[in-house]
Amino acid sequence: MITDIASYLRFFDSVRRRTERDVAALPPGAAAWRAPAVDGKPGWSIGQIVGHIGGSRLYFASAYRDEGWIWSEPESDPAEQATWLPWLQASAARFAEQLRDTPEAWLARRIEMIDTPGQALSGWRLLMMMLEHEVHHRSQIDAYAGLEGWPVPDIFGRSAESIDALQTDQRLKHARRA
């Protein structure tokens, strides 16, 4: 459970930095990339996903502030990669500003869901939904990048292989069998 906004915003800052890092790592060809159509419906481009991440931050902030589940149009051009990072940065700053001075009691108050009248969730859960949503779409971008053979940054600056290489020492240090 999230118990104070300052702690939440510090965690959000770490999540948004990783999103920006991964988007910044995309090659110039990423702007032209398109997901394959499914059932005749075109998939979103990476630029559309980036725009959606930024807009969704403000959507969740609006709901948390009891201003309605209001969607903000992305202030980026899906076809212009140069607009992606500025939009992510601007939406992150606006999100943090909209939450920074909200009362701590709002973390526990109930917020009615947009599509299920009578169903509500606590403020802290809504804020965690925003983070899960962002990580979901960042992972989507990273999966597409990997499938295209583009570089995908390690999530915490560590690869699975680098951790595997340390396992023998860890097992010895902690006296566990392999």
Over which residues does each language-model region extend?
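C-terminal ligand-sensing/allosteric alpha-helical core of TetR-family HTH transcriptional regulators
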Residues: 15, 22, 52, 56, ...
